[in-house]
C-alpha cells in the first residue's frame, strides 16, 4: 500500500481541483498510458487495486509505472459523533488527480495485452480515463 513515510502535517485542507494537470500529461517511460479525463481523489487502495489488475493480466511480464502517489491525508469523524469538536482523525491517503494526468504506464508487452491490462485498471478507478500511446519522436 502506498503511504508517505513522514508528513509535516497530519491533517490538510481539502483544496480545489480546478482546470487540468500542469505536468505529467504525456507518456514518458512506457509505450502506453492511462490518462484521466475527469478530476477526482484517488485513494491508495484504488491505486493498488489497479496495479494488481494490470500485473495479473500481464502475468508479471512487462513493466508497470505508477506515476501518482497518495500524499494527501483525508479525515473522517466517527459514527454517531456530533458536529463540532474539531476535525476528525486521519482515515487514509489520496492523490488529487486532475484531468489530463497520466496515472499508469505500461511497456514490454504486445499492444493488445497492454490495452486490455489498462482497460482492467480503468474499472478500478473513480475517474474517467482514456488509453493513450506514446508519441513517436
From Swiss-Prot:
Keywords: Ribonucleoprotein, Ribosomal protein, RNA-binding, rRNA-binding, tRNA-binding
Pfam families, per database record: Ribosomal_L16
Gene3D superfamilies referenced in this protein's UniProt entry, alphabetically: Ribosomal protein L10e/L16
Any single Gene Ontology cellular-component annotation: cytosolic large ribosomal subunit
InterPro entries membership: Ribosomal_uL16, Ribosomal_uL16_bact-type, Ribosomal_uL16_CS, Ribosomal_uL16_dom, Ribosomal_uL16_sf
Superkingdom per UniProt: Bacteria
SUPFAM superfamilies the UniProt entry points to: Ribosomal protein L16p/L10e
GO terms for MF: rRNA binding; structural constituent of ribosome; tRNA binding
Keyword Acetylation annotated: no
Any single biological process term in GO: translation
Membrane-crossing segments per the record: none
Subunit structure comment from the entry: Part of the 50S ribosomal subunit.
Family (UniProt): Belongs to the universal ribosomal protein uL16 family.
Described purpose of this protein according to its UniProt entry: Binds 23S rRNA and is also seen to make contacts with the A and possibly P site tRNAs.
NCBIfam families: rplP_bact
PANTHER family: 50S/60S RIBOSOMAL PROTEIN L16, LARGE RIBOSOMAL SUBUNIT PROTEIN UL16M
Record's protein name: Large ribosomal subunit protein uL16
